[in-house]
């Protein structure tokens, strides 16, 4: 009887401990919401604005505007991107580029799913190679 009880308790404890651990990454690998750059406070990544294109996960990078040659234009790197998260890296392709191959960058979603760190795929802060974005919506 004692062996039976021990044999029942251990699996129950293992199941209970596994229930408390969840992966913040959605099972389909697609993020949602609007995320703001921790340092600039203005650069935003919006995962909800663009519809999926040909099955690809997409986001819109909004960097604001600047005046160039007397014209008010979007800041460099603004626009639509396709992405695919693979472990601790993200493949990013700027959809306004003539290049076909996506570029890999470091990527790490926080344990609580409220922020992520990503390699510098756009010129957010000069000299900074990894950037933190926090979810605001």
Where are these regions (language model features)?
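N-terminal glycine/threonine-rich, aromatic-flanked beta-hairpin/loop signature
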Residues: 42-91, 95
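Sec-dependent signal peptide recognition
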Residues: 2-9
């Amino acid at each position: 009887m004692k062996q039976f009880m021990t044999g029942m308790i251990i699996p129950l404890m293992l199941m209970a401990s596994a229930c408390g651990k969840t992966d913040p990454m959605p099972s389909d690998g697609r993020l949602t919401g609007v995320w703001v750059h921790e340092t600039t406070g203005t650069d935003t990544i919006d995962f909800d604005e663009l519809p999926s294109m040909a099955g690809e996960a997409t986001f819109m990078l909004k960097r604001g505007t600047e005046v160039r040659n007397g014209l008010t234009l979007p800041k460099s790197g603004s626009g639509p991107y396709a992405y695919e998260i693979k472990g601790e890296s993200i493949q990013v392709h700027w959809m306004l580029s003539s290049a076909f191959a996506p570029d890999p960058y470091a990527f790490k979603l926080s344990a609580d799913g409220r922020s992520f760190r990503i390699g510098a795929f756009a010129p957010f802060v000069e000299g900074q190679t990894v950037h933190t974005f926090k979810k605001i919506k």
